[in-house]
Swiss-Prot record:
Residues 680-690 have a biased composition (Polar residues). The keyword Repeat applies. This is Neuronal PAS domain-containing protein 3. Residues 119-138, 219-257, 457-555, 576-645, 664-774 are annotated as: Disordered. Pfam families: bHLH_HIF1A, PAS, PAS_3. It comes from Mus musculus (Mouse). The gene is Npas3.
Length: 925
């Protein structure tokens, strides 16, 4: 029963049955491991459930499915987020999650940077959605509007492609909020890699402090010192060392607050990592490129408008330009540029010849000088900072600066500098300084630097000196280099001593007289070589301002030189010339030698004329010299007596600063007197002021100091008769002296400058006393000029008589004579005391054919015409005419000869009549 029940229930009733039952169950459901089975003890027996492995597998499957689902959703969201980034799909599809998050954060910060900054960068493309209720036909836009929209959609990329660099924006922590994809062109780095990263990860450790300062931050203590203290070699490999750890900039006590005194503009140089650099190319750091950062700090929009609070800095927006590689063979040579090589102190050691194409400087002018010598004073500080950047980083680009010109003005220039090392000698370093011209010369001939001041007067005097040497090379053996050096020395000394001319004037008087006496004894008329050495301005003391005594003041860059034609070949010698002393009291000492030989007296006369020229003409060459005051009460018209032997053709030269072609083939020599003078057969220099003695017969003659750039007018001096010298005739001059009057009534007198002042000297034939100050009037322009010509003195171009002699007359002046009046323009004012001119005398007509007239019978007709054309007023030596007699002359000043060649031919002169002292004016021809 029990067996049957047991069998019917299927449960074993004994041990044997239980064992067989278990074996049968195991065969049907094999268990991999006994431990995986659980035995559950119950009151009715023991049984085994399904394996734990199956349950675990199901759980794992569900977990994997859930994780896969979550990852899919996450990836989908990241993918959707990446598509929102302003990046190409080819880039966003390959971004990892961290990059997507980093770029997203940077983009969000960038939008805040744009919208919250001052001024806000509102996107033009953003706006309310189009009004869909409006019909499509009404919403249709014009083709131009569509074109503008398409263009603006790609405007950013066009701008980036046009830039010779890349753009990036940093926040106040120094992280890249944005950087353009063009950074890969210049640094080889990826835009995705840099965006959201710290700028200090890519900046040279030596530039961390500067970068932090530009952002208004400071580095942790010791971090900047560590970077700055490294050597160049250590800094080159710092990216792989512990120093290259990204410094965490800490904000300052007032972190991003900018005072009103600070500027927002930024311009500096840093070195950034680059994968495009060649090994060994960069001098200061390998693996880095020098980047020029120019930008502006961006401020946050102030929240309170009622009060002024310091604005908070949000970051920095910059344009970065990678400097050209330091190898000079990779620099493109443009048309408006020139290259110089300088040493580490910016001392120029080489310059291209192309510099002369753009400015008035030559390589000779700048080689050996420092660049700072040619930089405008306001730009020196900027160049100094660029110099420091160059020494620290190896490359730099200067700001726009002004390069000073030689004769005034400047040119705007920008330079790119690179340190180059000699491959053969590593210790030999120099700088390749490439200059790019940005403008044409500005403010020409306007001195803006003290270095430009000496060149302006030298430019005017160089032309006259050059013409002097050219004339001497034709007429004489020439002027030595010592003479030229003495001229330049005198110019410098004169400019230095021009402020106090009186002491130097006294010195020059004694020194000149001593030299004159020495030359009288030591030189003979037969030694032209020895006289050549004296035919210059010998001492700088003679060049000091003395317009109050021996000239017309500062007379501009021109001078008149009077030459005499003679008839004898033996007279072709140059008389000794010296500078003119201003003290005529000492000149009168030589008047006691009236009975000396004619050659000796003529030498003295020429020396004094040279002094006259040296005293006044040299002052004209220096425009900086001011005209000293003049004691008008001591103005005296000088006169000189000469023998009839000296009657010859005067050659008056007007030197002009501007170069003029005066070749013999030039049309200007076709004028009759010039045509005669152009024959260099018998040149004779009358550049010395005449003495108080007789005119000697010319023994030694030579070429004048005058040059080719002069207007030559032949004036026979025998027709220039002297002014009367009675008791009321005129004032004493340095040329009057006490010499006896020669018997020849037609010996030409000398009327010196009306501004000459001499306390000593006797009267003329009329015996004027020392106190004689009676003034006579000129009858016109010609009379004044003739008397000055007769005195062989330098005379200015008379424009108008507008006032008394002013001590401050510094206007640029030109000079001319009656022969050059039709060529030289009137530009100066001759100020006479009380609008008076030197003494004049009534016309006393003479026979031009008489022996006393002093003319060679073979004189050309045109010479005689010009000779008589200037006669107009001079009377015999012995005749003394009062001032009242001038009123008897005809207003037209037409004259004829008494019995001569032109007895029936009237010749008008330049005068417009006689004017009273109150209304006398100079008329411009």
């Amino acid at each position: 029963m029990g067996r049957a029940g047991a069998a019917a229930n299927g449960t074993p009733q004994n041990v044997q049955g239980i064992t067989s039952y278990q074996q049968r169950i195991t065969a049907q459901h094999p268990l991999p491991n006994q431990s995986e089975c659980r035995k559950i003890y119950r009151y009715d027996g023991i049984y085994c459930e399904s394996t734990y492995q199956n349950l675990q597998a199901l759980r794992k499957e569900k977990s994997r499915d859930a994780a896969r689902s979550r990852r899919g959703k996450e990836n989908f969201e990241f993918y959707e987020l990446a598509k929102l980034l302003p990046l190409p799909a080819a880039i966003t599809s390959q971004l990892d999650k961290a990059s997507i998050i980093r770029l997203t954060i940077s983009y969000l910060k960038m939008r805040d940077f744009a919208n919250q900054g001052d001024p806000p960068w509102n996107l033009r493309m953003e706006g309310p959605p189009p009004n869909t209720s409006v019909k499509g036909a009404q919403r249709r836009r014009s083709p131009s509007a569509l074109a503008i929209e398409v263009f603006e959609a790609h405007l950013g990329s066009h701008i980036l492609q046009s830039l010779d660099g890349f753009v990036f924006a940093l926040n106040q922590e120094g992280k890249f909020l944005y950087i353009s994809e063009t950074v890969s062109i210049y640094l080889g780095l990826s835009q995705v890699e840099l965006t959201g990263s710290s700028v200090f990860d890519y900046v040279h450790p030596g530039d961390h402090v500067e970068m932090a300062e530009q952002l208004g931050m400071k580095l942790p203590p010791g971090r900047g010192l560590l970077s700055q203290g490294t050597t160049e070699d250590a800094a080159s490999s710092a990216s792989s060392s512990s120093q290259s750890e990204t410094p965490e900039p800490v904000e300052t006590t007032s972190p991003s607050l900018l005072t009103t005194d600070n500027t927002l503009e930024r311009s500096f140089f840093i070195r950034m990592k680059s994968t495009l650099t060649k090994r060994g190319v960069h001098i200061k750091s390998s693996g880095y490129k020098v980047i020029h950062i120019t930008g502006r700090l961006r401020l946050r929009v102030p929240l309170s408008h009622g009060r002024t609070v310091p604005s908070q800095i949000m970051g920095l927006v910059v344009v970065a330009h990678a400097l050209p590689p330091p190898t000079i063979n990779e620099v493109r040579i443009d048309c408006h540029m020139f290259v110089t090589r300088v040493n580490m102190d910016l001392n120029i050691i080489y310059c291209e010849n192309r510099i002369s194409d753009y400015m008035d400087l030559t390589p000779v002018d700048i080689v050996g000088k420092r660049c700072y010598h040619f930089i405008h004073a306001e730009d020196v500080e900027g160049i100094r900072h660029s110099h420091l950047d160059l020494l620290n980083k190896g490359q730099c680009v200067t700001k726009y600066y002004r390069w000073m010109q030689k004769n005034g003005g400047y040119i705007w220039i920008q330079s790119s500098a690179t340190i180059a090392i000699n491959a053969k000698n590593a210790n030999e370093k120099n700088i390749i300084w490439v200059n790019y011209l940005l403008s044409n010369p500005e403010y020409k001939d306007t001195p803006m630097d003290i270095a430009q001041l000496p060149h302006l007067p030298e430019k005017a005097s160089e032309s006259s000196e050059t013409s002097d040497s050219e004339s001497d090379s034709k007429d004489t053996s020439g002027i030595t280099e010592d003479n030229e050096n003495s001229k330049s020395d005198e110019k410098g000394n004169q400019s230095e001593n021009s402020e106090d001319p009186e002491p130097d004037r006294k010195k020059s008087g004694s020194a000149c007289d001593n030299d004159m006496n020495c030359n009288d004894d030591g030189h003979s008329s037969s030694n032209p070589d020895s006289r050549d050495s004296d035919d210059s301005f010998e001492h700088s003391d003679f060049e000091h301002p003395k317009a109050a005594e021996d000239g017309f003041g500062a007379l501009g860059p021109m001078q008149i030189k009077v030459e005499r034609y003679v008839e004898s070949e033996a007279d072709l010698r140059l008389q000794p010339c010296e500078s003119l002393t201003s003290d005529s009291a000492k000149d009168s000492d030589s008047a006691n030698e009236a009975g000396a030989q004619a050659s000796s007296k003529h030498q003295k006369r020429k020396r004094r004329r040279k002094r006259q020229k040296g005293g006044s003409a040299s002052r004209r060459r220096l425009s900086s010299a001011s005209s000293p005051g003049l004691d008008a009460g001591l103005v005296e018209p000088p006169r000189l007596l000469s023998s009839p032997h000296s009657a010859s053709v005067l050659k008056i030269k007007t030197e002009i600063a501007e170069p003029i072609n005066f070749d013999n083939e030039s049309s200007i020599w076709n004028y009759p007197p010039n045509r005669e003078i152009s024959r260099n057969e018998s040149p004779y220099s009358m550049t010395k002021p005449p003495t108080s003695e007789h005119f000697p017969s010319p023994q030694g003659q030579g070429g004048s100091i005058g040059g080719g750039g002069a207007l030559h007018v032949a004036i026979p001096d025998s027709v220039l008769t002297p002014p009367g010298a009675d008791g009321t005739a005129g004032r004493k001059t340095q040329f009057s002296g006490t010499a006896p009057v020669p018997s020849d009534p037609l010996s030409p007198p000398l009327s010196a400058s009306p501004r000459d002042k001499h306390p000593g000297g006797g009267a003329g034939s009329g015996g004027g006393g020392p106190g004689a100050s009676n003034s006579l009037l000129y009858t016109g322009d010609l009379e004044a000029l003739q008397r000055l010509q007769a005195g062989n003195v330098v005379l200015p171009l008379v424009h108008r008589v507008t006032g008394t002699l002013a001590a401050t007359s510094t206007a640029a002046q030109r000079v001319y004579t009656t022969g050059t009046i039709r060529y030289a323009p009137a530009e100066v004012t001759l100020a006479m005391q009380g609008n008076l001119l030197p003494n004049a005398h009534a016309v006393n007509f003479v026979d031009v054919n008489s022996p006393g007239f002093g003319l060679d019978p073979k004189t050309p007709m045109e010479m005689l015409y010009h000779h008589v054309h200037r006669l107009n007023m001079s009377g015999p030596f012995g005749g003394a005419v009062s001032a009242a007699s001038l009123t008897q002359m005809p207003g037209g000043n037409v004259f004829t000869t008494a019995e001569g060649l032109f007895s029936t031919l009237p010749f008008p002169v330049y005068s417009n009549g006689i004017h009273a002292a109150q209304t006398l004016e100079r008329k411009e021809d």
